[in-house]
């Protein structure tokens, strides 16, 4: 199945994530403790959500984070890991260049 999409938008106050097969969510910049740009992440197993040949979306569980929210395009190796005090989110854009650009822009929004 080749359906699904992930859309990440950086607003003035938060990260908005719209992804197929899951509820949209937002992460306020003030809640973010740190972020990482990764290309070696083991996504683990799906708890609830979708896993097809195009996207992985929903709640997943892995050894590194335990239960976390995931919204990624499978064809893009880079992803941004967003840590808050209570949760971990992993997202990416539709290509590597856009994902790196989003990471760099997000860094400027969370750094005082």
Residue ranges and their predicted role:
Residues 1-6:
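Alpha-helical transmembrane spans
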Residues 9-16:
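Juxtamembrane extracytosolic/periplasmic "stalk" immediately C-terminal to the first targeting helix
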Residues 12, 29-30:
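Structural motif detector for alpha-helix initiation sites
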Residues 19-27, 33-85:
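Non-transmembrane, membrane-adjacent beta-strand/coil modules in membrane-associated proteins
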Residues 36-38, 74-112:
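Terminal and domain-flanking low-complexity segments
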């Amino acid at each position: 199945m080749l359906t699904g999409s992930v859309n990440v938008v950086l607003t003035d106050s938060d990260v908005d994530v719209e992804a197929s097969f899951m509820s949209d969510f937002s992460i306020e910049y003030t809640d973010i403790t740190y972020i990482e740009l990764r290309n070696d992440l083991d996504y683990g197993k799906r708890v609830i959500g979708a896993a097809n040949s195009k996207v992985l979306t929903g709640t997943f569980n892995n050894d590194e984070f335990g239960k976390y929210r995931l919204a990624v395009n499978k064809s893009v190796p880079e992803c941004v890991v967003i840590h808050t005090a209570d949760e971990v989110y992993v997202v990416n854009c539709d290509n590597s260049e856009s994902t790196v650009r989003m990471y760099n822009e997000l860094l400027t929004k969370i750094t005082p």
